[in-house]
């Protein structure tokens, strides 16, 4: 079969970084083609070039044998290329229907007929299999529902090439299954799907072929994904063998460092109690809506709590806001690192130093020399991959952004408790190992760590103990010797006769 999409010697550089170097591969018509690589490997840059968002320095893109000369996203759109990014491109203030038909509103005599628009979109969504109210404002939807709207938009536009960048990172299992069904239907129509993901299960389930990038270069191209293995792909991604991505090892545990009794709040109505010892990593697992992130926000003081007591090293603390929590020795790395974690538009240096300024000066002012020294120390310690501490943090990969957030809190004095929500979401397998190593080092130093994750293998891989949540309650408290994937998942599933302990 002839190639439908072809990348030929694509190169793209930025100051101090060669993001892509002579990348070439082809994709057949109607194929789902996987694109993998560590964060910073060049995947996002290649997608930006394909979408017309950025121009390549050299090389060509061909679609159905025709060389593409587009220089903008609009040009790429007219060529039949649609990219669905992790950062969604919807207008929150508009309805679902208005977003799906933006720029193409059905009108008569210059007047938009809202009823016609909503009914048209409702019919299209039903046809696709997406159950979302077309009259709902996008701002009222969950992140997962917004992702489904983006995907529906691409389907309705009859694109020839659709690139999906980590499409299931915010989807529930049910939403993911709907997406997979849509991909199968698009494939049958002859649409080319470029599927960017770190999830090997999805890659093997969906993809016909696969390209692996490493350090901006083509590390491997597999025309038939069935002829490769997970271990081979991981080795190609990282350039080395990773036999145990989790790297868990037993550590001596001290006394109780964090104790929580009867914690509840507006979105967590059932009181929760637990404790974490010095050097312990306590994992929280649950399905979407189980209350994990709500618990973290209450603990940190980001949301007001109804009741409950929190003690750190036996001293009662009242984290009614994040500042109070930090003063008590507790910090949070939030679930959505782009919007709640990093300070966009600021440098790596500024993001690391922002929480430490009060320790250097009563006026919260750091000299350029102090700020640079602090940033350099944590860039080296946490192995942040960047050409310069002055680089805008938004240009870093997800794994390196997470390291910078950790560096910010490690530079804060007197931190005893770290709460980290979805520590490796959207992060490649090599960077995951590095994040886990950082957590192990912190635990070995006596820090109490609470890890919240929707990925059960991750929670089981790195935790000393697991609290399973279901419908706002603790459904199980499992010690490491008793870890069993089936039992933990069963405890996490909603049940009228809920809960107990394993």
UniProtKB/Swiss-Prot annotation:
Gene name tied to this protein: araG
Species this chain originates from: Rhizobium johnstonii (strain DSM 114642 / LMG 32736 / 3841) (Rhizobium leguminosarum bv. viciae)
Principal place of residence: membrane
Protein name: Arabinose import ATP-binding protein AraG
One GO term describing the cellular component: plasma membrane
Role: Part of the ABC transporter complex AraFGH involved in arabinose import. Responsible for energy coupling to the transport system.
UniProt enzyme class: translocase
Self-association state and partner proteins as the record states: The complex is composed of two ATP-binding proteins (AraG), two transmembrane proteins (AraH) and a solute-binding protein (AraF).
Residues covered by the ABC transporter domain: 5-240, 253-496
Keywords: ATP-binding, Cell inner membrane, Cell membrane, Membrane, Nucleotide-binding, Repeat, Sugar transport, Translocase, Transport
Keyword Amino-acid biosynthesis set for record: no
Localization (cell): Cell inner membrane
Family to which the UniProt record says this protein belongs: Belongs to the ABC transporter superfamily. Arabinose importer (TC 3.A.1.2.2) family.
The enzyme's E.C. designation: 7.5.2.12
Membrane topology: Peripheral membrane protein
One MF term in the entry's GO annotations: ATP hydrolysis activity
Catalytic activities: L-arabinose(out) + ATP + H2O = L-arabinose(in) + ADP + phosphate + H(+)
Keyword Heme in record: no
Binding site for ATP: 37-44
């Amino acid at each position: 079969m002839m190639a439908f999409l072809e990348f030929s010697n694509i190169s793209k550089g930025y100051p101090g970084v060669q993001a892509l170097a002579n990348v070439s591969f082809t994709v057949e018509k109607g194929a789902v083609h996987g694109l993998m690589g560590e964060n910073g490997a060049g995947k996002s840059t290649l997608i930006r070039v394909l979408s017309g968002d950025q121009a390549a320095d050299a090389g060509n893109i061909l679609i159905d044998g025709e060389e593409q000369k587009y220089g903008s996203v609009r040009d790429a759109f007219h060529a039949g290329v649609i990219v669905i990014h992790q950062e969604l491109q919807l207008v929150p203030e508009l309805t679902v229907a208005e977003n799906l038909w933006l720029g193409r509103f059905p009108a008569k005599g210059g007047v938009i007929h809202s009823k016609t628009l909503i009914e048209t979109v409702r019919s299209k969504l039903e046809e696709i299999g997406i159950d979302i109210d077309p009259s709902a404002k996008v701002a009222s939807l969950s992140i997962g529902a917004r992702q489904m709207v983006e995907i529906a938009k691409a389907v309705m536009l009859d694109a020839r090439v659709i690139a999906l960048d980590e499409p299931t990172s915010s989807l529930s299992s049910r939403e993911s299954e709907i997406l997979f069904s849509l991909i199968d239907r698009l494939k049958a129509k002859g649409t080319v799907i470029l599927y960017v993901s770190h999830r090997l299960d999805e890659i093997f389930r969906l993809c016909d072929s696969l390209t692996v990038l490493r350090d901006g270069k083509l590390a491997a191209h597999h025309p038939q994904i069935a002829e490769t293995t997970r271990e081979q792909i991981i080795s190609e991604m990282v350039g080395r063998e990773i036999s145990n991505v989790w790297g868990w090892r037993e550590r001596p545990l001290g006394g109780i460092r964090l104790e929580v009794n009867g914690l509840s709040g507006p979105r967590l109505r059932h009181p929760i109690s637990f404790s974490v010892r010095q050097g312990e990593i306590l994992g929280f697992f649950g399905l979407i809506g189980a209350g994990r992130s709500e618990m973290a926000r209450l603990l940190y003081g980001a949301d007001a709590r109804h009741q409950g007591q929190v003690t750190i090293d036996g001293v009662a603390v009242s984290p009614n806001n994040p500042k109070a929590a930090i003063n008590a020795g507790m910090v949070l790395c939030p679930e959505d690192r782009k919007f709640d974690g990093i300070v966009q538009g600021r440098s790596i240096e500024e993001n690391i130093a922002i929480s430490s300024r009060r320790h250097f000066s009563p006026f919260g002012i750091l000299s350029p020399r102090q700020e640079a020294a602090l940033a350099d120390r944590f860039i080296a310690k946490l192995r942040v991959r960047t050409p310069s501490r002055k680089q805008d943090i938004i240009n870093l990969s997800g794994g390196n952004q997470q390291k910078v957030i950790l560096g910010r809190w490690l530079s804060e004095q007197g931190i005893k408790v770290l709460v980290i929500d979805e520590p490796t979401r959207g992060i490649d397998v090599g960077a995951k190992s590095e994040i886990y190593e950082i957590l192990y080092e912190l635990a070995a130093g006596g820090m109490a760590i609470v890890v919240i994750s929707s990925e059960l293998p991750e929670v089981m891989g790195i935790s000393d103990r697991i609290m399973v949540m279901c419908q706002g309650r603790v459904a199980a408290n499992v010690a490491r010797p008793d870890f069993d994937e089936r039992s933990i998942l069963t405890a996490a599933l909603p049940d009228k006769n809920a809960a107990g302990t394993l």
